[in-house]
Structure formats: C-alpha cells, structure tokens
C-alpha cells in the first residue's frame, strides 16, 4: 500500500516521499 500511495503522495507531499524512500 505504501508503495502505491508513495508515488501519489510523493508528488503531493515531498516530506512523505522522503520518509517513504528512507523506509
């Protein structure tokens, strides 16, 4: 789920993108 949402959230929220990339 995080992988799919990560792509969508990454564009909307850069902070979440960085957090997901680190995880």
From Swiss-Prot:
It is found in: Secreted. Keywords: Allergen, Amidation, Antibiotic, Antimicrobial, Cytolysis, Disulfide bond, Hemolysis, Secreted, Toxin. Expressed by the venom gland. The keyword Disulfide bond applies. One of its GO terms (biological process) is killing of cells of another organism. Belongs to the formicidae venom precursor-01 superfamily. Ant pilosulin family. Dekan et al., 2017 and Nixon et al., 2020 report synthesis and functional analysis of heterodimers with different disulfide patterns as well as different A and B chain monomeric forms. This is M-myrmeciitoxin-Mp2b. It comes from Myrmecia pilosula (Jack jumper ant).
